[in-house]
């Protein structure tokens, strides 16, 4: 977004996020640069990806549910541009953190995704704390 490109906004949000996270004993945080900038030492970092075609189909269903008339090709084009903008922007570009687990959601439905995420979290807890 236009606001996310502003350096002073990113800095203020970074400070707020870091302070919020420090006050929490256990926290799940989502965001573009959480794993690479805000919480580089997090116990578990996930980086989600999905094919453009599948993202566009999902987004189109959202638009259709809102009775918006838009074509799949238009949605694909917008998503391709958004991904390009996100990965190439100068301030906090979208990158996969070094030790983040890549999660490709292209072929997963919501239930499968939920199971996968729960298993990743359980495994991370087991590695850090053993069997609880």
Located regions from the model:
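ATP-dependent small-molecule kinase phosphotransfer cores
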Residues: 1-26, 53, 73-90, 101, ...
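Core, highly hydrophobic multi-pass alpha-helical transmembrane subunits of bioenergetic inner membranes
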Residues: 51-52, 79, 127-132
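NTP-dependent small-molecule kinase module
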Residues: 60-65, 84-132
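Short helix-capping segments at alpha-helix termini
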Residues: 67-71
